Amino acid sequence: MKKTRVINKRNLSTMIIGMVTIAVAIVCVFLYVSKPKQTNKSSQSYLNGVDVDKLQKKVGKDFEGTYLLKDYVVYGETLSLYKSKYGSTETDKMQGNNIVLKNVMTDATTSFTFNGSVDSGVDLGTLKEGIYELYTYNHFEKERIYFKDAFKAKAVTTMRRDEKVTSVSFMADKNALKEYGIQFKKNYAFIIVTSQEPNEDIYDVVIDPCGNAMNYFSNTVDVGASTSVLDEASSSLEFAKKVKKELEKKGLKVKILRKENETPGYYGANGRPARAYKTKAKLYLALGASLDENVYAPYMLTSPYTNSGLANTVSYFMEQNGLTLYEARTNTTQENGVLYDSYAESDNGKVLEYELYPQLRETGGKATYAGVYGDEFKNVDYKDAYGMYGLYFSYASAMNSQSVTYYNENADAIAKILVKSIVRYFEI
């Protein structure tokens, strides 16, 4: 007679639990493997899920007037468009023009004014997901923007807002929508905005604690403004950590560009600008000290190619919150404590287009002529790069004990209001 093995209740229960555990594990592995990776998500476009029939009906194909442009610049989160090659004329014909973006699928329009500065133009950080046609006005006539040569620019990833970012693609190509059954007669310009999860390799802000910078010309380390009352290298790093902490509270990803014992300079593959460009940050915040004995409070330097928009915002909120700034400004369009960086001069006294501070010149990419000033050690890899919005914040003078005392007593408050201003300017 064949023997029958009897399974007791405890063994049966153990077997069932084991089978369920294995099944759950298989499902989890399947879900993990099939889950879209971050790189896959970043390759997706708004157009991947668009209603093709609706797109074909709504996108413009023929226009009464068209407007030819030749160049563009990206600075921070701003896209500026030019009638001539950037820098080839003193006043570009686009200056004073409105740039109108029309959302193809919703018909909503957004207008931006270009006043000639690289922080004016299309504010990419404010654009909602969608595909946009670009127009401008020529003698009060609305005309469709196009370029002679087709291109697709490198996508811009905007700063983190509510734990989200957008990927912004700018292109001009008669075949841009060919796969959707749409072709154009000219290389019309489009902007495509796609909502994405943040990529952990992309930062929002980089902070440069000034001082301890390698001078590649003399092969020595420039320690910075170092006196008996303030050491720029250590003070800047300490202040950078305060500012970083406040920025991170706002949901921004921040990188400090040097460690305590490092001495990176402003040129070459391991220089501070190179480190910054690799992060794809939108803001380059330099924190430094002055050697001017007349400076009794903080002030700011900004690129003369900008409107001083960010610096003006910082100045406004500093004074609104009872903080003192050094009484200085370059012109009446600037708030208190805001100065433009100076231009370099040639040997015969001719004013050049290059500004002096590498923290501003070498970090603004094409917009500030990065990589083209001087004869050696140029950052040539970044001369056509998208620029970071540069701000040099001088928190104290190492030659003025009153200034140092004021900074030491108010460093926390200054850091908080500086960050508040950045958040307000970029509408984080």
Residue spans for each PLM region:
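Active-site-proximal helix/loop segments of hydrolytic enzymes
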Residues: 234-428
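Active-site histidine-acidic residue metal-binding/catalytic motifs
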Residues: 184-273, 279
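Short helix/strand-bridging catalytic loops that position acidic/His residues to coordinate divalent metals
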Residues: 118, 224-230, 297-303
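Gram-positive cell-envelope targeting signals
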Residues: 1-48, 81
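Extended low-complexity, serine/threonine- and proline-enriched intrinsically disordered segments
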Residues: 90-108
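Non-catalytic propeptide/linker segments at domain boundaries
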Residues: 107-210
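Hydrophobic beta-strand residues in large extracellular and virion-surface proteins
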Residues: 79-81, 99-101, 112, 124, ...
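Short, compositionally biased P/S/T/A/G/V-rich stretches that sit at domain boundaries
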Residues: 31-79, 84
